[in-house]
Amino acid sequence: GPRMFPAGHAIGITGGHADTTGYVPGVLERGPESGIADGVDEVIAAVRPQIKHGAKVIKTCATAGVLSFEGPVGAQQYSEEELAALVAEAHRHGVKVAAHAHGTQGIRAAVLAGVDSIEHCSLLDADTITLMKQRGTWLVPTTYLGEAIDLDNLPPLLRRKAEWVLPRARE
């Protein structure tokens, strides 16, 4: 049968790609269990409940995203110190780390922090590919998103972001 490596929700910064706490009061209030974490101590505290509840992979948002309203696509969100703390805590428990990352700066920071895989890699350069190979970091391209996203039904800002990044993800 299939081998499953379940992850919980993504861990990200306040106001970042993973932050859905502002949509409905009382749902996913900010705290370690929400996955919203700022600073080294909060990042470590956010990893632990996920492991407690059976996550075999910790997913973090190292950069801003395409289908969220915060920041330009690919802008680095976590600091190098925060990423390193998240990776160290997960690895201490034998759990892998996957990083959502579109932009080169955030991808490099995540790779240098020791993440096991980078999801998307839409705006990747040759030097960072070399670094990923040297570090043994898996690249998980999501080039299918160009076919899966209905651009006509996106809000204008998200449509512009998607129209800009999706063709670059295939290069």
Please give the residue ranges for each predicted region:
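Divalent-metal coordination cores built from histidine and acidic residues
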Residues: G1-H93, T128-T130, R135-P155, R159
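Structured core elements
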Residues: F5, K59, A98, S117-E119
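Generic beta-sheet signal
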Residues: A7, H100, H120-C121, T142
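N-terminal active-site wall of soluble small-molecule enzyme domains
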Residues: S79-A85, A90, A98-V111
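A post-motif C-terminal structural segment
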Residues: V115-S117, R135, L139, W164-R168
